[in-house]
């Protein structure tokens, strides 16, 4: 979770893989990251990874607001190439949650409240990072937080005990399954 330059990350990755290759089973390490390719206002330690170090694209809400599938795919494909160049092979991203609770503190990490738009953006991101089929130049993704992390009671974060209750007002649970 450090916000360091791409060349330092690549050197670190190469050294790690060299160490793994020297072990009896020579099993490579898989290093994962949160998103690294967005414009952010603050490059806080452990957050906003890659700020100022990787190509900067709009954040999640900005990508969705553009309503341009080709541009979202291009973002993901270019980002994939940068990740591959330094040895990152897995991303803990993106949030498929719908922004249905306005008090939730993580709305900026979603693609908004429209299930159809969020699904369209997620599809292009998966295709851009992974391809239509996993292959040697794919970046594996873990989409989070299924289902409906954005529908938490009182806007609390579901990572904590007090945010474990999700409310789907008006029977909107099905909307999270698009």
What residue ranges belong to the model's regions?
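Glycoside hydrolase catalytic-domain context in secreted enzymes
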Residues: 1-178
């Amino acid at each position: 979770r450090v916000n360091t330059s791409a060349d330092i990350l690549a050197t670190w990755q190469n050294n790690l893989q060299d160490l793994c290759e020297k072990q009896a089973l020579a099993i490579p390490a898989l290093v994962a990251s949160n998103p690294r390719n967005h414009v952010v206002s603050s490059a806080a330690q452990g957050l906003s990874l890659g700020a100022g170090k990787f190509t900067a694209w709009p954040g999640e809400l900005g990508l969705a607001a553009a309503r341009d599938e080709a541009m979202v795919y291009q973002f993901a494909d270019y980002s994939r190439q940068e990740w591959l160049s330094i040895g990152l092979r897995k991303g803990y991203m993106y949030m498929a949650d719908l922004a249905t609770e306005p008090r939730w503190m993580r709305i900026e990490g979603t693609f908004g409240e429209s299930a159809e738009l969020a699904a369209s953006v997620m599809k292009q991101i998966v295709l851009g990072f992974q391809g239509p089929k996993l292959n040697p130049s794919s970046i594996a993704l873990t989409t989070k937080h299924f289902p409906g992390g954005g529908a938490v009671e009182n806007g609390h974060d579901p990572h904590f005990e007090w945010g474990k209750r999700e409310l789907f007002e008006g029977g909107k649970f099905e909307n999270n399954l698009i």
